[in-house]
């Protein structure tokens, strides 16, 4: 079989290549969005609006409960706050949600939302229901700088980082859609979060960290760090910091075990090689047999799926004494993709070789392929549909809501 010649991709740039200003900027209507603010920033926003410090502390506590525990977006429903104070808040502040441009449901129950920011940037999130859990796949950037050749998002240019409000807003919107307010630890559909949507989370470290701290706060969304996984293609200098400052589970987009192949399909490898990446995994704070590091490995026909590749992967995991499991991902096709998925028998053989070495290597069942929501298929629909068409859809949605 003839393969396309490898294309030399630019090596991704420095950390946080598109910084987002962290000062509070009013919306077009002059109001400040409270979503995404830390407790201290929420209190400071009230003080800046001339509320005296003692009042600001009390109101911040009440607002926190209504925003993150009850899911409120309207100050009028916050009944333990005096009516005149609710009016005062409504004049100065807002609790936002991302704009939903399009919502799709797969035949397997997977849901995908196309979202649009205030400045007109589009990004996607996906909810994957299972019998024992429900996982929300969250985006961290509009586009991506990594250029991974098997990934649809990698064909997009990086536009900008998502803000903490835009990241946590995806979780809030999913809770809205699932009817899961007030927040409660038992019986909810949204049980897990994976930072595996559009973008490289560690190239937007501060905003991802701040958003996940909101998600993990016990007085609000209250999702345990053990139910959150952050995926990186291998931004080695930021991995230890992620473990120390966020402390969630780590997944690594490995996908190849030779320099030649990984340089081609994950260009970041030319900056941070496999050996350095695996050492960073070995040093990751909190990794142990109860909290294993997940290695993601997309199965590409005649590219990375030989028996020798499986055995070398086992050798490397043992060499670095990594508490690890391997997720084997059948390649999910997208228009113009340069690869094909490995044959099912080859995937099964690859998995079996790793299992026989005592390392868990399940094959992930593709979910949401029919709506381009599966792993590696996300791409802003603004690049697949005309802006006029998207605007028309948004207008029709608004008209339907009255």
Curated annotation (Swiss-Prot):
How is the cofactor bound here? Binds 1 [4Fe-4S] cluster. The cluster is coordinated with 3 cysteines and an exchangeable S-adenosyl-L-methionine.
Which top-rank group of organisms is this from?
Bacteria
Keywords assigned by UniProt?
4Fe-4S, Cytoplasm, Disulfide bond, Iron, Iron-sulfur, Metal-binding, Methyltransferase, rRNA processing, S-adenosyl-L-methionine, Transferase, tRNA processing
> Record keywords: Cytoplasm included?
yes
Spell out the InterPro entries in the cross-references. Answer: Aldolase_TIM (IPR013785), Methyltransferase_A (IPR040072), RlmN_N (IPR048641), RNA_MTrfase_RlmN (IPR027492), rRNA_lsu_MTrfase_RlmN/Cfr (IPR004383), rSAM (IPR007197)
Q: Which Pfam families match?
A: Radical_SAM, RlmN_N
Q: Where does S-adenosyl-L-methionine bind?
A: 199-200, 231, 253-255, 332
Q: Where is the Radical SAM core domain positioned along the sequence? A: 130-370
Q: What else is known?
A: Reaction proceeds by a ping-pong mechanism involving intermediate methylation of a conserved cysteine residue.
Q: Name the family.
A: Belongs to the radical SAM superfamily. RlmN family.
- Which NCBIfam families would you find in this protein's record? rRNA_mod_RlmN
Q: What is this protein called?
A: Dual-specificity RNA methyltransferase RlmN
